[in-house]
Amino acid sequence: MDSFRITGGKPLEGEVLLSGAKNAASKMMLASVLTEEEVVLSNVPRQRETEITQEIITTVGSQLTWKEEHVVSMQAKEVTAAEVKKLSRKNRLSILALPLLLHRVGEVFVPQVGGDQIGPRPVNFHLQTLEKMGATIE
């Protein structure tokens, strides 16, 4: 649909605050582990998905601070862990942490990933891509 027709007799006015997208925010939060520099994201929704992502990146050594309600600062000066075992069953984001940890630490340990129950979503293509880049998967 290219347009909306609104009828009502009165002009619309006011402001609408749009929340950030949890899926995009979680992936950007994970990507912050790639650099030692501070990364600041705004309009980040604070809900379960971003809280689990926060737990994943702080578990591996990143520092994270909520500066404001929807502004988060992250810095991964020293990534000290290559394991996200207990968190991997909470959602599927841990599979996206694989290349980040391989880059920063050189190895990674992640058991079977969890997440929602919307149907089968295999991770084999992630693993095959890592193998093509030289990773060994056991």
What are these regions (language model features)?
Residues 1-138:
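Structural preference for solvent-exposed beta-strand-turn elements
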